[in-house]
Amino acid sequence: MLFLLPAMLCADQEYLEVTASADRKIALAVAPPVSQGGGENSEITRNASDALRFDMELSGRFTILDATRAGGISGIRPGEFDLAPWRAAGAEYLIKSAYLLNGESTIMEFRLYDVTSGRQLLAKRYSGKNKDARKMAHSFSDEILLLQTKEKGPFTGKIAFVSKKSGNKEIYLMDYDGHNVQRITANGSINLNPDFSPNGREIIYTSYKKGNSNLYRRDLFSTAEARISAHPGINITGRWSPDGSRIALALSKDGNAEIYAISKDGRQLTRLTRTGAIETSPAWSPDGGKIAFLSDRLGKPQIFVMNANGSDPYRLTTSGDYNVSPSWSPKGDRILYCRQHSGGFQIHSITPDGNDDLQLTSEGSNEHPRWSPDGRFITFSSTRGGGQSIYVMRADGSGQTRVSRSGNSDSHPVWSPRW
């Protein structure tokens, strides 16, 4: 468990917002954490520094300087160190941090400085286990984005994904940057399409562990699990509604695959499409009023949008012969999907009215796009570099970075709400 202690300082928010609003990236130095007592721990130093640098680089707002020790290893509070060496190294902003060890527990303190003016902009202190150093750093990164943009970052979130690292397709969980991987399922079968509940405590997923492709709901903190949809045929591509009360999914209990909505306990079922075509992969709009989905009602797979009660469907994608895997931005302004190109799939982003279609990827075959909870980043799977791995990128397609390292067919990522 990670605890946020009372904030020590939060100053000059207006100044940081104005500075960060420019297109130019800010030169940022990240000083390695220093010990304030209880001994030294090289893992804390390395993990916190690496996490901060990764977060700030992905944010797209900073250029990370290779000047980690420009100012030596002096203190972190105002007046305890000299900003001049950092200024000489070209830093505009500086993150300083320290830790206080007490056995397996630690208190970490982070501070953000404007090197040019000498002002401290932000300070936070966290308490947790030594192994939580990365999470503490991610929490501070979230606060930096909050200070810049008035919205917290998504860096404390997790990514659930499917991997064959055990030999079968099982569900795993990892930090969004690929660290702290843990296995969620261990049934030796095929498990697919994880999706987080809005509060992040539960996931739903499809499993063939009983022979049929049934939908399950699992509590990530207690491991309690319930089978919520086991109709004959497929029970696949489940997605939580934004309020957590319903789940949209595809069922083939009456023949072809159609879109349904069920209550989260599986007791109430409502059919939403009735076309006789194959229709799967529902994706809710953030207000819960609409659903994007895949349909071949016109002969080839395309993305459609309908009201959440199934009424007034319209075709979203009009280019490409094979478009799949819609994902609606939490901001409501874009929908991701995958289009088949020569050589594989590529991820596109389009407005809900079908305009401004942008191709975001080009290297390898790229699938399963999902948004971060703030809508500023995307996670997806890609075959670039051999095998299939999980990547993250910014919403405009820049900053594409590999985060999973198993090399064992990692796919179907989904980014959790903030933990």
Tell me the role of every PLM-derived stretch.
Residues I159, I203, G244-A248, G288-A292, ...:
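Hydrophobic beta-strand positions that form the internal "hydrophobic ladder"
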Residues D175-L192, R218-I236, I262-T280, M306-Y322, ...:
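Multi-bladed beta-propeller domains
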Residues G153-F155, P198-N199, P242-D243, P286-D287, ...:
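Residue-level detector of Asp-centered blade-edge/turn motifs that repeat once per structural unit
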Residues E14, R77-E143:
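Amphipathic beta-strand/beta-sheet edge segments enriched in Tyr/Trp
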Residues Y15-L83, I95, Y99:
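Short beta-strand->alpha-helix linker/helix-N-cap micro-motif
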Residues S105-I107, G167-Y172, N212-Y216, N256-Y260, ...:
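Structural motif
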